[in-house]
Regions:
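N-terminal nucleotide-binding beta1-loop-alpha1 segment
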Residues: 1-20
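Hydrophobic targeting segments
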Residues: 5-10, 33, 48-51
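Conserved SAM-binding loop
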Residues: 25-26, 51, 107
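Short active-site oxyanion
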Residues: 45-50, 134, 214-215
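Short phosphate-binding loop-to-helix
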Residues: 57-106, 115, 121-125
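Conserved core of the sugar-phosphate nucleotidyltransferase
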Residues: 86, 113-204, 210-212
Length: 250
């Protein structure tokens, strides 16, 4: 049986503002982006690993750690407001023009250096077993329920997300409300048809892939020490410390 073509795409523009040049930041002895490249290359189900970048230095470092740089990302897809859809559409059209269309595209964000390859493989396997699915999103259980959240309209509060059948969900015990999950960026997978034909990163049929525990990412400078410590624990095979327990009323 022919192995499925699975493309790992790591988007890494040069103009990050919250942490300048963060994709090249040294974290526990390696550039941040090197970890995601390593995750993709160590995954037995990934057949090709590329980095989409507009930056020469990121391109050079990515090549050094084993990624392909088949193109330079155009400027319009490398702004602060550029969307994932723009980035992935550009890559897929580039490859389509050259006769290559993968079955799946695995989205690995370079800001998350702590991943377990077996979970990436499990997510890919799940998508391969569900050809009807347009995409897969990794998720985690939300600590706060949106059914107890509010927005301010004028001088007064309005419930942010009313729940059908629960007229006063804001005053109900949290345990009686439906579980809600947030997307955590650990690993996302999408079919090319979803992007090119549906103009979407998720489509209509989205598989859930629950990843438990803390997700370590770099978004702000103050996160750097904790992120480096998490990477060092991960390299030693040590678990994260147990989180503090919070007591919820009602």
């Amino acid at each position: 049986m022919k192995k499925a073509e699975v493309l790992a795409l790591i988007p890494a523009r040069g103009g990050s503002k919250s942490v300048p040049r963060k994709n090249l930041l040294d974290v526990a002895g390696k550039p941040l982006i090197a970890y995601s490249i390593g995750h993709a290359r160590d995954c037995s189900l990934v057949t090709r690993t590329i980095v989409s970048t507009d930056d020469d230095e990121i391109a050079d470092v990515s090549r050094r750690f084993g990624a392909e740089i088949p193109f330079r990302r155009p400027a319009e897809a490398a702004t602060d407001t550029a969307t994932d859809l723009q980035v992935f559409r550009h890559a897929l059209l580039f490859f389509q023009e050259r006769g290559y269309t993968p079955e799946l595209v695995v989205h690995l964000r370079p800001t998350g250096p702590v991943r377990h390859v077996h979970l990436i493989e499990r997510a890919i396997g799940l998508m391969l077993r569900h050809p009807e699915a347009d995409s897969l999103r990794s998720i985690g259980l939300a600590e706060q329920t949106p059914y107890k959240m509010w927005r301010i309209e004028g001088q007064y509060l309005q419930q942010a997300l009313p729940l059908e059948g629960f007229p006063e969900s804001h005053s109900m015990p949290r345990q009686k409300l439906p579980a809600v999950y947030h997307q955590n960026g650990y690993v996302d997978i999408v079919r090319p048809r979803t992007i090119l034909e549906m103009d979407s990163m998720v489509g209509h049929t989205v598989l859930p892939f629950v990843v438990e525990g803390k997700i370590h990412e770099l978004d702000y400078p103050e996160q750097i020490p904790a992120l480096a410590a998490a990477v060092e624990r991960w390299q030693r095979g040590e678990p994260d410390p147990e989180p503090e327990k919070h007591r919820h009323s009602a």
